Amino acid sequence: MPIVPLTRDQFRWKNPVKPTIPTTTTTTHTAGISSARQRSLNPILNSTLGFEKILAINLPERTDHRDMLVLSAAVSDIHIDFLEGVRGETVLKDVLPAAIKEEYGPKIIGSWRAHINALSAIVEEGWGSALILEDDLHWDVRLKEQLQNFALASDVFLRTEGGAATIDLRDADTSNIPKTSPYGDDWDILWIGHCGMDLPEDGPIVLLNNDTTTVTIRNQVSWDSKAKPPMRVFPEHTRAIADARTMVCTLAYAVSQNAARNLLWDIALKRLDHPFDVLLAKWCDGINGFEKHRCVGVLPQIMDHYSPSGNVQWSVRANMDKILHGDTDYRYQERPQEEGDPRDE
C-alpha cells in the first residue's frame, strides 16, 4: 500500500476560535419594523458596520494603540484597515494650504494631514463610504445593536424637513428602505465618536427612548468638564440623533464619497485656519465661508476616548479579560462623586 504524504494543512493544529462578543440581530427599536427594513439593516452586522471600509489612523510608534484596536476589533467581528499617522515635522511647508495660521505646530498639522490622507484614500479608491477612526477610542460590546438603532433614527432624521420637533423613534415612520446606505440617503458625515456636541434648538431631534445601552446622565462627560450634559433635559437612558452642531474631536466619523471629495477641495487644498476637527465642524455647520452640509450627530456618543468611566457603558476594552474568557457579566465603572460637580446639580 503506497504511503500518502500528509499535506501542510494536515500538520497544522486546528485551534478552536476564541470567544467573540455575541451579536444581537433584533434590538429594542428594530423589533417592530418590517422584515424588509430589518434586512436593509443587516449590512451593519458585517465586519465593516455597513460602510465600505473602516480606516484607523495610527502613528507607527504607538504600537499599544494599534494592538488594543486590533484586539477590540477582533472580538467585535470588525475589520479595520490601518493608515499611518503623520508627524507634522515631516509635512513640507509647500504643501500646506495658503490659508493657514502660522502659529500652528506639528501636532495640529500632523493630525490634519493624517485625516486628509484618509479622505484622499476614500476618493482614490472610489469607496461609497468609509468610517474613519482615531486609534485611542473604545466602544460598547453592543456596538452593532447601537448602530442598528442609530441607523433607524438617522434615516428618520434625514427625511424630516425642518422644524424644532422632538421625535420619539417609536412613533416615527420607520418603513422607509434607504437606497444607498442602511443609515439613510444623502448624508455627508455620520459623527458617531466625538468629545461633545450641542443639541440644536432649530431642528428636529430623534430620540431613542429606553436605550439601556446608554450611561446615566451624571456619567456623561465631554471636553468641557464644567458643562452640564445636554441630555439632562431628557429622561435617563435616552439617546439623541440630530444635526451635528459645534462638534469637538474626530474620534469616529463616517464619510460619503461625495463628502470626501468636497472635503479634499475645501479643507485639504484651500485652508488650514483651524485644527481639523474644528474645520470639519464648521464645514458641517455651514459657517466661516463653508456651505451647510448634512452631518448627523449622536449624543451620548457611540464611540469615545478610552476611559474606564464615561460615555461607554460596557466598554470592550475595559471588559477585555471577561470577553476573552467567554464571560458576559460585563462591568461599568461609575464616575466618582465629586463635590461641586455641575453634573450632580
Over which residues does each language-model region extend?
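An acidic/histidine-cluster motif and surrounding catalytic segment
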Residues: 1-133, 137-345
